[in-house]
A protein has these predicted regions:
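Conserved small-residue
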Residues: 186, 196, 216, 293, ...
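C-terminal helical/tail subdomains of lipid-metabolizing enzymes
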Residues: 2-4, 107, 378, 399, ...
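Patatin-like phospholipase
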Residues: 187-276, 303-325, 508, 512
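Helix-rich "cap/lid" substructures immediately adjacent to catalytic or cofactor-binding pockets
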Residues: 147-210, 563
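Short boundary motifs at domain starts and secondary-structure transition points
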Residues: 167-174, 282-285, 396
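A short alpha-helix-loop-beta-strand transition element characteristic
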Residues: 275-291
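Active-site gating loop/helix substructures
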Residues: 292-421
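N-terminal low-complexity/intrinsically disordered extensions
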Residues: 1-176, 534-560
Length: 563
């Protein structure tokens, strides 16, 4: 939404024009297709994305006009679109009984001619036609011309790859989608995600893969730790957060972050929550739901040019920031630093780094990954307290050629594009997914938080790149204040209610996209849900028992207002 005076404020700071120029520059450098590309160019650049958008529109039109297509016609149109998306996939990975380990098979070259024909035939009704009913009727007419040839295409592919996959495994790849949930940053505004997850889980939609940035990485790490997800217990756990528990005076020395007013002590507060039953800290590979964390790596050249207050932690004592007790609040010093955070939201300054359970980062502690992803430059500064992590983080910074790690939102606050690329590159084995994005940090007009305007505006420029990859974007509203990192119990309850209400309209869309499709017979490919592996996480009863709530009136006041 437009924000009064925001444009004038940004132009006075000389930032608005530069930011818009950067968006054009980043799109040119990325090689990703802008929305203005022709169908042929978009198909050549990213055919799977074009077909994803066509299926999305088909499903939305059908939800609004359910009497135009029969259930069978909708199912077969969706099957054709998803069959045309086939390229690389891992046989056996798709569907509720999917398993990994067989490696990828490539069929993209064989499917390419059929892909081109399908796109040419369905592009007009599913991308160009503005009237939903006319679009559905046009798609129905096209279906009649494609059915016989689709049957031949499917049969030939199965015959050619009889030793690679079965007909059931092919139909599972085409017919079943994984639910990918993207959790964006936004500080205390992100507590609404707990309610959003409550509604999602109540609908039976458990994420198959998640990726989180900034505060979204904290909520994501909770949801991913064990199955079934004890989301109501997480809401109760959130009510125990206090400023004194999560913030402290800045450390004088650090190896992997920037200087800031506060040390982020999330690793201490969430130690039991994100530890295994044997007492060891949970690693990315221990999570029950595949989960990736986005952090922003500060490039070495921009890092060297930063003001010394960002780089030299030892100067903390000179500004009295090492005192053991600090008042909580957005005073002039913190507000001034927050204005400067917008300068980090620039891909020339930072680069996205994905910490995942595959590859070299599989042994990174979950709590450390979430802490670095939430490290607001110049304000919140984390550092691992686990000696085992030091060489791992050293190697990560060296491999990525970065000097420090900061808030993942600086690189990608709602990282839908990264999630899409991770799935395309084989994160789940299957490449067929529904992408649901959560965004709690979008522009609001609030005279109390004018200092947030440059940040929210810069983050919204990132959405130009990310939005095309989402099947549905939930913009949570209302939310708690982004600066309210330790809400009261009543505020958590409100945030959960707002979160449930915000996600409600998305359920119909995700339910329709997750509905399986098939080509032959009267039901989807038979698949038995795989047996759930035992969670490595500590029990929630042990987590809640380990929390020591302050007793006494003064201690409760100090916990809420002092570090």
């Amino acid at each position: 939404m437009p924000i009064p005076f925001a444009d004038g404020m940004l132009s006075r700071l000389g930032r608005r024009g530069a930011a818009l120029d950067l968006i054009e520059e980043f799109e040119d450098e990325s090689g990703e297709p802008p929305a203005s590309l022709s169908p042929a160019d978009l198909l050549a650049a990213e055919p799977a994305l074009l077909l994803q958008k066509m299926e999305n529109r088909l499903v939305r039109h059908h939800l609004a006009n359910p009497d135009v297509l029969s259930g069978e016609q909708l199912r077969k149109l969706r099957y054709i679109l998803n069959f045309a998306r086939l390229a690389d996939f891992e046989p056996g990975a798709a569907g509720p009984g999917g398993s990994r380990g067989r490696g990828d098979i490539s069929v993209g070259g064989q499917v390419a001619p059929w892909r081109s024909r399908g796109v040419d035939a369905l592009y007009a009704p599913l991308r160009e036609e503005p009237d939903p009913v006319t679009a559905l009727e046009g798609a129905k007419d096209v279906l009649a011309t494609l059915v016989d040839d689709q049957d031949d295409q499917r049969r030939v592919l199965i015959e050619r790859h009889g030793s690679d996959f079965s007909a059931t495994e092919l139909d599972a790849e085409v017919g079943y989608k994984k639910l990918v949930t993207v959790l964006g940053g936004g500080g205390g505004a992100g507590f609404v995600y707990i309610g959003g997850m409550q509604r999602l889980l109540a609908a039976g939609q458990v994420p198959d893969y998640m990726i989180g940035s900034s505060f979204g990485s904290i909520i994501g790490s909770l949801v991913a730790r064990e199955l079934p997800v004890p989301i109501d217990e997480y809401a109760e756990w959130a009510k125990t957060v206090s400023y004194r528990a999560i913030l402290g005076p800045e450390r004088r020395r650090s190896r992997h972050g920037l200087a800031g007013k506060f040390t982020l002590r999330f690793d201490q507060f969430a130690h039991t929550l994100l530890s295994r039953a044997d007492g060891e800290r949970m690693r990315m590979s221990d999570l029950a739901i595949p989960f990736d964390v986005v952090v922003a790596g500060v490039r070495r050249q921009p890092y060297a040019a930063l003001p010394s207050r960002f780089r030299h932690r030892e100067r903390s004592t000179l500004t009295l920031r090492s005192l053991p007790f600090l008042p909580i609040g957005i005073g002039p010093w913190v507000a001034a630093r927050m204005w400067q955070v917008a300068a980090f939201i620039d891909l020339r300054v930072v680069k996205p780094i994905v910490i995942s359970a595959d590859g070299a980062t599989r042994d990174v502690n979950v709590v450390d990954a979430a802490s670095f992803s939430s490290a607001i430059p110049g304000v919140l500064h984390p550092e691992t307290s686990d000696p085992r992590m030091l060489p791992i983080l050293d190697e990560l910074c060296a491999d990525q050629d970065v000097a420090a790690m900061v808030d993942g939102g600086a690189a990608s606050n709602v990282p839908v594009e990264l999630a899409w690329e991770r799935v395309r590159d084989g994160r789940l084995g299957t490449r067929n997914a529904c992408y649901l994005a959560f965004d709690c940090f979008h522009p609001h007009w609030d005279p109390r938080h004018l200092w947030l305007v440059p940040i929210t505006q810069a983050v919204q420029l990132q959405m130009v790149r990310n939005l095309p990859y989402a099947d549905h974007l939930v913009r949570f509203e209302p939310t708690l204040s982004p600066v309210n990192l330790a809400p009261s119990a009543a505020a958590i309850d409100r945030a959960c209610r707002w979160g449930r209400d915000s996600v409600e309209p998305a359920i119909a869309v995700t339910s329709a996209l997750l509905e399986p499709t098939w080509w032959e017979g009267d039901r989807p490919p038979a698949a038995e849900p795989k047996e759930r592996t035992k969670s490595a996480a500590s029990s929630m009863s042990a987590v809640m028992a380990a929390i020591q709530a302050p007793t006494g009136r003064f201690r409760r006041w100090r916990s809420r207002h002092l570090t």
